[in-house]
Amino acid sequence: LAVNDIVLTREGNIRIVQFNVYVNGTLLNTYLADGVIISTPTGSTGYNLSAGGPVVEPTASIIVITPICSHALNTSSVVLSAEDVIEVEVCPGRYGRQEEVALCYDGAVRRKMVSGDRVCIRRAEETAKLIKLSKESFMKTMREKMKGN
């Protein structure tokens, strides 16, 4: 389980990896990128934001897919319903080379993947209750954090 994000990113050699991303069984896009971030609203202000993804209000019921350093000019984040099922497939590299990818949940490497492997990502049936320690609104907190940017 992940609270913030699930990241697939290249492992070892510094080169882009090809990923096929499916939503509810239909191909959404093929990304040539350093990786792909699948983020919850809670995780949208972390790695997703650093990779150019949108900030999402924490109570929104959505999932964000953001490519990391995509090798294309027309790729941007995609915002989906939290009910959607996302599959990410690691594709073979140039000349059929076996690619190695790290699958990370909330920043910790959980497993290695290779060309042909797929991971299925969906919202868990379990829910978590989060404690809000500040009385400040989300918008005020975001405004304060973004001041220097």
Pin down the residues of each PLM region.
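Catalytic phosphate-donor-binding core of small-molecule kinases
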Residues: 1-37, 45-149
